[in-house]
Amino acid sequence: MKLLSFISVTVLGAAVAVWFVVGSAADQPPLEGWMAQFTLNDPPQPAPETEVLTVAGEPVTLAAYKDKIVLVNFWATWCVPCVREMPSLDRLQAAFDKDKFLILAVSVDRGGAAKAVPFLKKHGIDNLTTLLDKRMKLASA
């Protein structure tokens, strides 16, 4: 009987240990490789109030989009991975109502709208809301 109790307690202890290890690992994001470059704010921080420009040259901050779910994507015409992901982001935006979910494609090209807008037209990127951050103030905030 003592052996059975010992085995039961051992199995229960092992199960609890596994639960703690797996549970705590699931709570942590995978920050290995290139993902380690990301900074996680816990608790989440408000978006910076840094001004950027619309393609029409109007100043705007991220606060203008506070009632929406917003994905902010920094990109440049010279960034190969950025160029590759733009069509996917464009299709993703097309699948959602911009009043609820908005993808902000923030160009960090030094050429501003003169560089970004023709590039987007050439590649058929029609659904993304494009902002300009040629001095990388928002990108580095």
Regions found by a protein language model. Give the residues of each.
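Conserved redox-active cysteine motifs that mediate thiol-disulfide chemistry
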Residues: 66, 74-94
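N-terminal targeting signals for export/organelle localization
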Residues: 1-49
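A short beta-strand-turn-helix
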Residues: 42-45, 49-70, 93-96, 140
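Short helix-capping segments at alpha-helix termini
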Residues: 95-100, 123-127
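Residue-level recognition of beta-strand->loop/alpha-helix junctions
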Residues: 107-109
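Thiol/disulfide oxidoreductase modules built on the thioredoxin-like
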Residues: 118-127, 132-141
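Short alpha-helix adjacent to the SAM-binding motif of class I
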Residues: 84, 91, 114-122
